[in-house]
Each structure stands twice: as structure tokens, then as C-alpha cells.
A protein has these predicted regions:
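Short coil/turn connectors at secondary-structure junctions
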Residues: 26, 33-34, 44-48, 88-92, ...
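Residue-level signal for inorganic ion chemistry
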Residues: 38, 79, 87, 127, ...
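Polyanion-binding loop/helix "lid" in catalytic or ligand-binding cores
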Residues: 190-233
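Small-aliphatic-rich amphipathic alpha-helix that forms the alpha element of a beta-alpha
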Residues: 70-94, 111-122, 206, 212, ...
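Glycine-rich anion-binding loops of enzyme active sites
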Residues: 56, 89-181, 304
């Protein structure tokens, strides 16, 4: 492999060859190629601009065996998940890509841009700028979207008596990471690992669900660090606590089968699920039930918002204080 190819490809060559096709959208006046992007934003609609950013670093957020296509899709999906938690519609994104010289090759960059494009097209958002530089592999995406005024879901609106819901399945992300780190695996786990592999690298951003629930949910957060940790963040912002019924957690049958001793911990503390955890007042619970029955929203109730005692905001599990040692993923620990 030509170790000097990064010198032969300028930043502008890389952009022109691999990322130019991601910029086409009617509301993008000037995308990549200028000092800054210029986009049309119709303030007459009285929408908030929603901005979310995440950095994914090799060896911290994805294994060093991950392929370019998969890294790109994971980076897109986890950022879109933040917009989903706000009830926002994605519009644009920027990309900060740091590459070691051995990866700055047409094949790797082509796979990476192909992964970006599939997700960008699926969620109708355009690349409008960014930066490329040499260094250890990391991907930073800043996602921009919009949401009507007074309709954004935040973390601070939960009230005592609200029902706690989660979308999708919990524990898949932790099970997937365990699979990735423990290869080779028994053949029965390998057959299941394709679903888990996709759940890790392509978690479904719950944009549709966010739009459906934003008019009835009182608070929302996406589950990146683990249900208990993220629900505790929500409770702390709302000055409340929560009680979760462990038996109500939605866990995929295959995860239960392959990890009978660990699936509860995966669901509660594992993280990387990128599902939505949200609260709905009892007065709107019938409406929520109709959304679930019509399959507009794939979600289940798992608990209730309760009053905090003198110890501050907590998440109880079946009425008992959670083991603080297992409070979810923390960066750099």
C-alpha cells in the first residue's frame, strides 16, 4: 500500500472524489467547497434549529477491526438518534474525519462515503461541510435538524406519575459488542451475530417514533450509555426519580437464549442501543396505546416516574435502589 498517497491526494481531492455527491439538496446554496456552508432556513415556520454532535474514536467507540462502510453508518446513526430524541427532522450534517495515512486510500474512502450516502439518502439529509486531517482514526459528525417551536422533547419535562416507555429492544448493543470482542464464537452464536452486528453498526434512528410521540411525551432521551444511566440523566433534569419493572424490559429472544445470565445487565447497563426512553402522562396513555396498537410506534411501558427522596434522583429496579457500580458507560474509564 502506498504510504505517501495522502500527499498525492489533497483534502480537496478527497472531498471532490468521495464526498461531493452527498451535498445535493435544494436547500443547500453552498455546501462543501467554500469556507462555510450556506443553507436556506425558513424561519417563517417558527422552527427551532436542532444541533447534535458526536465523535467516534477507534478502539473506544468501535473495534479496530471495523470496516469503513460500517464505521460511517454507525457514526451517522448515533447522531441521528440524538435528533430523534428531540423529535426533530434531519436536514444537514458536517463531517470531521481524521485518518491515519494507511487508510487514506481510494478504496477505504469509497467504502466510507458509500456508507454515509446510504444513511444520508434514507433520512434525507445533506453533507454541507467538514474537515479531513491526518491522525488516529476518528469520525466527528454534527447533525442539524429542525423541530416546531414548543414541540421539542427535552429531558426536563417528566412529572410524577408519568409512564416510562422505551422503543425497540434493549441489550442488543452490549450483546453485539461482546460478540465482536469474543470472536471466534460457537456456531449458534455466529448465526445470530449478523442481526447483532447490524444493531451495533446500524442502530435504527427512531426519527419516525420521535415525530409520532413529540406531541404527547413530556421528556425523552436516547439510550446510548445504558437504560439506567440515561433514565437517571432524564430524572435528574426533571428533579424526579423512576421505578423500572425489570420483567417488562423488551429483550430479544435470541439475546436471552445466548446470554441467559447476562441479558438483564445488558438491557439495564450495557448501552449502545440507541432506542428512545420517554415519559407520557397518564392522561395521554390511551393515545400512546393507540399509537402502539396501530404500529406507528414500537414501544412498551417499563415503569413510572416517582418522587425523589433526600438522596436525589435515582432509578429503582423493582422498587429497590440500583447498584451504583453498574450505572452505564462512562467515557475514558
Amino acid at each position: 500500500m502506498d504510504q505517501t498517497s495522502l500527499n498525492h491526494q489533497t483534502e480537496f481531492d478527497i472531498i471532490r472524489s468521495h464526498f461531493k455527491d452527498l451535498t445535493h439538496q435544494k436547500d443547500v446554496e453552498k455546501g462543501i467547497g467554500d469556507d462555510a456552508a450556506l443553507v436556506k432556513f425558513n424561519s417563517e415556520h417558527n422552527n427551532h434549529l436542532v444541533v447534535a454532535t458526536d465523535t467516534l474514536i477507534e478502539g473506544v467507540h468501535f473495534p479496530n477491526t471495523a470496516g469503513a462502510f460500517d464505521i460511517a453508518q454507525r457514526a451517522m446513526c448515533v447522531n441521528l438518534s440524538d435528533l430523534a430524541a428531540m423529535g426533530a427532522v434531519p436536514r444537514w450534517f458536517t463531517l470531521g474525519l481524521t485518518l491515519p495515512i494507511n487508510l487514506a486510500q481510494p478504496e477505504w474512502l469509497g467504502q466510507f462515503s458509500a456508507g454515509l450516502k446510504i444513511i444520508a439518502d434514507q433520512y434525507d439529509c445533506a453533507l454541507i461541510g467538514g474537515d479531513t486531517t491526518r491522525g488516529p482514526l476518528s469520525v466527528n459528525i454534527t447533525m442539524l435538524g429542525e423541530v416546531p417551536l414548543q414541540e421539542a422533547m427535552c429531558r426536563d419535562g417528566a412529572s410524577i406519575g408519568d409512564i416510562v416507555y422505551v422503543t425497540g429492544f434493549l441489550g442488543d448493543g452490549a450483546a453485539a459488542l461482546k460478540n465482536e470482542l469474543e470472536k471466534p464464537q460457537p456456531s449458534d452464536v455466529v448465526r445470530e451475530s449478523e442481526r447483532l452486528f447490524n444493531r451495533f453498526y446500524r442502530p435504527t434512528p427512531r426519527i419516525k417514533e420521535g415525530l409520532e410521540i413529540r406531541s404527547i411525551a413530556t421528556a425523552c432521551i436516547d439510550i446510548s450509555d445504558g437504560l439506567v444511566a440515561d433514565l437517571e440523566h432524564l430524572c435528574r433534569s426533571s428533579n424526579t426519580s423512576a421505578n423500572v419493572s425489570i420483567e417488562n424490559l423488551p429483550i430479544h429472544p435470541e439475546v436471552k437464549k445466548h446470554y441467559p445470565e447476562q441479558y438483564s445487565d445488558f438491557a439495564l447497563f450495557g448501552g449502545d442501543d440507541y432506542e428512545l426512553c420517554f415519559t407520557v402522562p397518564e392522561s395521554k396513555n390511551l393515545v400512546m396505546g393507540e399509537l402502539i396498537e396501530s404500529r406507528s410506534v414500537n414501544a412498551v411501558p417499563i415503569g413510572k416516574i416517582i418522587k425523589s427522596n433526600g438522596s436525589g434522583s435515582r432509578v429503582l429496579l423493582n422498587g429497590r435502589v440500583c447498584n451504583s457500580i453498574k450505572t452505564g458507560y462512562k467515557h475514558f474509564e
